[in-house]
Each structure stands twice: as structure tokens, then as C-alpha cells.
Amino acid sequence: MKILHVTQGYTPAIGGTELLIQRVSEELVQQFGDDVTVFTTNCFNGEGFFNPKLPRLQPGNEEINGVKVRRFPVNSRISQMVRFPQKVAYRLNLPFNEYLRTISGGPIIPGLKKAIQEFPADIIAASSFPLLHMYAALNGARNSRKPCVLHGGIHPDDDWAFQRSRIYRAIAQSTYYLSNTKYEADYVIQQGVSPERVVVVGVGVDPEPFEQTSSTQAKKHFGFEEQPVVGFIGQFGGHKGVDTLLQAMTLVWEIFPDVQLLLAGAKTMFAQKVENIIHQLPEVYKKQIKLYYNFSNEEKPLLFSAVDVFAYPSGFESFGIAFLEAWAASKPVIGCRAGAIPWVIDEGKDGLLVDYKNQQMLAEAIIEFLKNSSWAKTLGEVGRQKVLSRYTWSKVAQKFREVYLEAIKQHGIQN
């Protein structure tokens, strides 16, 4: 099968969707011998879509682990120009505001639709909304009469990003839609998409590297003592709850003053706010915090193995792949009662849930794990078993492939 994946970023770009498409693409090549090509941008993250000053990857073609990758240059200046007008239009709920939001978010990629339309694929699959390349993939597929599968990564609680009627019109025109959780699937169906064309596939993780890394080895690598470590490992963004975690830790340190805090993620614009919050903390607390920016995928087993409690108090996620990575390292997790997260974490069985932006509840959950380390380890091990049974990349890639084959079949019947 000749597959074209269209996505906003690809390794060494960092992000959940970036990793998902990378690992699914590699598994399709290695497991099934499929011919997989990825069309993507030359940006390291989504901020590059509207900020022309950020560093870029080299545009052009390369091959990574058997996957052919073509990086297209992004025109950031147009998106940058409408960043302020779209904020005003959104605030005033003007009728054209969702189009301005789409343009401001980008990525604007000259020539992408034409390249998709001309590419000799059996199937075209694109990830993720609300970004512009999704429409290029759909229109390119329709113009070349090819089946199109859309993978949205929708988290409905993000009104700015996902309260856009054009997203659901596009999904209705696709051959199949892939969702990360049943929560997302139900929401898309509520927007009028036919249930028989919505499939839950989930996301995955490679458990083996996490098995081979000891906690002692990982803590030593990052310069931690043997005291417990609370960790956040993921994208630094406004909705991810890093600021809430820092506020919660001031309460934790009143009871457990020796606990260390690891904050690891890509150095985004929000990282400056995180640094400002840390700067305002008392010196005794600052010494307990380690910031670790722009880590590679290869470092993840070390990062997750170094923590004793994984706190990821994000306000909305389409899944939250970081929970799987923590479980792969047998760590207990804390998430928020928001979006798809309660469909991922079984509360009291493999993790705990708290209210979004509630620093008191988050602190109490962290303290509960620190006071009951044997119980915390039990929850982490239950999470690991869940990963092994349902969320390996091998299993997830098989689900993607089954949908691709069915999409090709259905498209043939319809034509």
C-alpha cells in the first residue's frame, strides 16, 4: 500500500501528533512493508507557523527509518499579520472570525495542495485539526479522486481551536475519521458526522526502552538526589497547567521540603512565563526545581524513569500520550477532570484526577502519592499493564492500517 501522511511536523519536531505520525509511519513500513511518504512543514513547532523569526529545519526530501519525508517551507508572515485581527474578531464573535482563526494558526504552505493532488498514493491521511494543511489534504484527495482519512486530535474544551463549523464539514466529506478516544468520537458524531465513519484508534508508546532504564540511573543522569521527584514532561503551553503545578508545589514543599521538581519540555513562548514564576519563588524552592528544555525522544525513558510522581494538569488533551509514557515507566499519574483525560485515566486504579487549575487539589494528590509510595507504585504498575495490552505502537499502527484498507475499499465501492 502506498500511503501519504500529511502532518504539521515530523521528527526532530516535538509534539504528540508529530510522534504519533512518526511511529505509525515507521510501523507501517517495518511491519507491513508499506511505502509511506510524509508531507510536513519545516517548523520545529506550531509557533513557527506565525513567527517567522524562529529557527527552521531545511526544506526538501530525506528518508528517516524507511519513511520518505518532504518538508515544505511555511509562509509565517501572513499568519502573523492576522494574529491581532483574529483576536478582535473572535472576541466580538464576528461571522468571519473562524476563517481568520484558521489563517492565523496556519500553516500556510504554498504548493501543498497541488503536491498532494499529484502524489501517486493509494490513500491520503492527515493529522491534525484545526490546522490549515488538513483542508489541503482533503481537497487534494478529492481532486485526485483518492480516499482521505482525517485524524483530528480534537479536544472540544478548546473553544478557540475547535468551535469551527468548517472542521466538521471537512470531517463529513472524508472517507473515515480517526479519533483518539471515545470521548472525541462521541463529540464528532454529535456534530453530525455519521457514526459508522468514526473509528477510535488511540495512541501508543514503545515500552521496551522504559523497561531498560532504572530510576536510580535516571536520577543520577539528571543530577537528582535519592529524594522523591515530581515531574511534568511535555509541551510547555498555556493550557498544560505548568503554572498550576508550580503553585501546588509550594504547598507540597511545606510538608515534603526535600521533594524535587522536574519540568521538561520544548522551549516555547510560554516557557518564559514559567521562568518568571520560578524567579519569584523563595530561593529554598528554586533549588528544588530543574528545567530541562528541548529533549529528544531518546531521552524520554530517562526523564520518565527519573520521576516518582508524574503530574500533567492539562486543561484539554485529545488523549495525552505523556500518560502512556509515564505508565510505560511504571509511574503513577495525575491528570485533570477535563476533556478526554477521564477516558484515559481510570481514577484510583492507575492514577488520580483533579480539577483543572485547582492547585490545592493537585497538591493534595501529589502529597497522597508521596505519603503512600507503595500504593503509588501499584497504580503505576497497573498503568503499565494497560499500556502493554492496548497502547503499543505496533497495535495502534495495525488499527490505522485496517482503517486505511477499509477506506480504499469503501472509496472503490462509492466510485
Give residue spans per PLM region.
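Glycosyltransferase donor-sugar binding loop
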Residues: F44-N45, V205, I233, Q260-E275
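Short alpha-helical donor nucleotide-sugar binding micro-motif in glycosyltransferases
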Residues: N294-F295, L302-V307
